[in-house]
């Protein structure tokens, strides 16, 4: 009922500039953990900046079920097993998180991506 006082609803707003990134590949890749894994959700969400020239071999996620990647800006080459996919802004891919995979930025600008790693 709109006339009664509303109950407190859960809302958690995050800003990238307030999150310290995990830096890898000599500073060519930055991972920002936006929402860490919790058993209640069964997933975690990251924002990633892949610098030009970066070739990042990702760890396989033995406990992960599906990895979802959404390209926000730039272009990235995603290798999953023996398959290679060219993704650009607006493209998304989902794959078995336990598969060997890597991310390559052959472009001249940053590739910005969102990752969702599902464990359910």
Go through the PLM ranges and name each one.
Residues 1-13:
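Short C-terminal boundary/hinge segments that cap the last helix of small helical domains
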Residues 21-54, 58, 116-120:
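A short glycine-rich, His/Asp/Glu-containing loop-to-beta-strand
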Residues 27-30, 41, 88, 97-120:
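Ligand-binding loop in jelly-roll beta-barrel domains
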Residues 47-50, 61-78:
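Short, conserved beta-strand element in jelly-roll/cupin
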Residues 55-56, 67, 74-79, 92-93, ...:
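Short beta-strand segments in beta-sandwich/barrel cores
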Residues 57-62, 104-106:
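Short histidine-centered beta-strand/loop micro-motifs
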Residues 81-97:
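Short acidic-glycine-tyrosine-enriched beta hairpin
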């Amino acid at each position: 009922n709109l006339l009664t006082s509303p109950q407190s609803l859960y809302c958690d707003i995050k800003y990238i500039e307030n999150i310290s990134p995990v830096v890898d590949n000599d500073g060519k890749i930055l991972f920002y953990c936006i929402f860490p894994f919790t058993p209640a959700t069964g997933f975690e969400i990251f924002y990633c900046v892949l610098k030009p020239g970066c070739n990042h071999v990702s760890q396989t996620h033995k406990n992960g079920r599906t990895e979802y990647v959404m390209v926000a800006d730039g272009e990235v080459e995603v290798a999953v097993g023996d398959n290679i996919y060219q993704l650009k802004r607006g493209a998304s891919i989902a794959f078995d998180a336990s598969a060997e995979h890597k991310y390559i930025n052959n472009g001249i600008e940053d590739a910005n991506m969102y990752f969702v790693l599902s464990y359910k």
